[in-house]
C-alpha cells in the first residue's frame, strides 16, 4: 500500500508487477536450479493450479493495486484491505465447509475494529468524508483475489517445497502481467526511467514484500490454515506505526493504543 502510493506516476503499474514477480522467479530459479529436476513431475501435475494461484495472489494483487494507488488514497486502500481476513473466513466457511468458532468470529471483528481505529486515526468523520472511485474497485478485486489465494494455498494440495512452489507461482504471476506491460509500452508509451528510487523500490518489492512476506505467509497458512493466518494482516497498521516511530520520528497517538487494545485480544480469540 505504501509503495503503491509512493511511486505513483513513476513506476508504471504493470511494469512494476512484472519486475517484482519476474525478479522473484529468476532469483528462485537460480538458487533452486539444482533441485528442480527431481520435482519436474510435480510441476507438470500442478501447473494449472499454480498458474491460477499465481494469477490471483501475484497477478490481481499486483498491477491493479499499483494502478489503484495512482487514483485513490492510502486510507481507502487500507480500509478495503482490512476486510480481507473476514472474506477469508467467509470463503473458507461457505465454499470449503470449514467450521468457524464463535470466538474466532469475535476475534476477527475485534481485530477489524482495531485496524479501522488506527487507519482513520480515531476520527469517524474520515469515513463519512471518504470519496470512492474506480481505483477502489481495483482494490476490492485485489482483496477478493488475495482472500481466494490464501484459502487456495491450504486447500490445493502440493508435493512441492515452499520455495519452489512460490517460484512457480511467481513465474505465472509475472506472465499474467505481460499483456498489460505491452499495453503500457506500445499504446500508452509509458516506459519506466531507471533511477536509484526505482532500484530501491524493486529491491524492497522482491526481497521484503515478495520473498519474505509471501513465503512466510504461505508457511503460516500451511500450518494454521487460511483463516488463522489471515489475522496476521491485522498487524500491518501496527508494524507501520512502529516503523514510523523508529525510522521517521513520529509520535504514537492515543488511537494507536486503542487500536492495539482491540487487535491483540482479537488475535488471541481468533487463534484459540
Where are the model-predicted features located?
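Specific transmembrane alpha-helical segments of multi-pass solute transporters/efflux pumps
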Residues: 1-3, 29-81, 117, 206-224
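Hydrophobic/small/kink-forming positions within alpha-helical transmembrane segments
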Residues: 2, 54-59, 63, 86-90, ...
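Membrane-interface helix termini and inter-helical loops of multi-pass transporters
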Residues: 2-13, 70, 119-132, 183-197, ...
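Hydrophobic/aromatic residues within transmembrane alpha-helices
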Residues: 7, 16, 20, 68, ...
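A helix-boundary/kink motif common to multi-pass secondary transporters
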Residues: 12-13, 73, 99-100, 161-162, ...
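Hydrophobic alpha-helical transmembrane segments of multi-pass integral membrane proteins
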Residues: 14-31, 52, 103-117, 134-141, ...
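Helix-helix packing/entry segments at the starts of transmembrane helices
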Residues: 17-19, 58, 62, 77-83, ...
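Hydrophobic transmembrane alpha-helices of multi-pass small-molecule transport proteins
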Residues: 28, 100-122, 234, 243, ...
Amino acid at each position: 500500500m505504501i509503495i503503491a502510493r509512493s511511486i505513483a506516476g513513476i513506476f508504471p503499474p504493470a511494469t512494476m508487477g512484472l519486475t517484482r514477480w519476474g525478479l522473484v522467479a529468476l532469483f528462485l530459479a537460480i538458487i533452486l536450479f539444482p533441485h528442480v529436476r527431481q520435482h519436474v513431475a510435480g510441476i507438470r501435475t500442478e501447473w494449472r493450479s499454480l498458474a491460477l494461484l499465481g494469477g490471483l495472489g501475484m497477478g490481481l494483487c499486483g498491477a491493479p493495486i499499483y494502478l489503484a494507488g495512482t487514483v485513490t488514497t492510502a486510507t481507502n486502500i487500507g480500509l478495503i484491505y482490512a476486510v480481507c481476513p473476514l472474506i477469508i473466513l467467509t470463503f473458507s466457511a461457505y465454499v470449503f465447509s470449514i467450521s468457524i468458532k464463535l470466538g474466532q468470529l469475535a476475534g476477527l471483528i475485534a481485530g477489524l475494529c482495531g485496524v479501522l481505529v488506527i487507519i482513520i486515526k480515531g476520527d469517524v468523520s474520515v469515513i463519512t468524508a471518504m470519496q470512492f472511485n474506480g481505483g477502489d474497485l481495483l482494490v476490492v478485486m485485489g482483496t477478493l483475489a488475495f482472500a481466494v489465494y490464501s484459502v487456495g494455498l491450504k486447500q490445493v494440495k502440493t508435493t512441492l517445497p515452499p520455495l519452489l512452489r512460490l517460484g512457480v507461482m511467481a513465474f505465472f504471476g509475472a506472465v499474467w502481467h505481460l499483456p498489460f506491460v505491452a499495453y503500457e509500452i506500445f499504446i500508452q508509451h509509458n516506459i519506466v526511467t531507471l533511477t536509484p528510487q526505482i532500484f530501491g523500490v524493486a529491491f524492497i518489492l522482491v526481497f521484503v514484500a515478495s520473498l519474505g512476506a509471501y513465503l512466510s505467509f504461505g508457511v503460516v497458512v500451511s500450518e494454521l490454515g487460511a483463516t488463522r493466518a489471515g489475522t496476521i494482516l491485522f498487524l500491518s497498521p501496527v508494524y507501520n506505526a512502529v516503523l514510523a516511530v523508529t525510522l521517521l520520528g513520529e509520535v504514537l497517538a492515543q488511537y494507536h493504543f486503542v487500536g492495539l487494545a482491540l487487535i491483540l485480544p482479537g488475535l488471541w480469540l481468533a487463534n484459540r
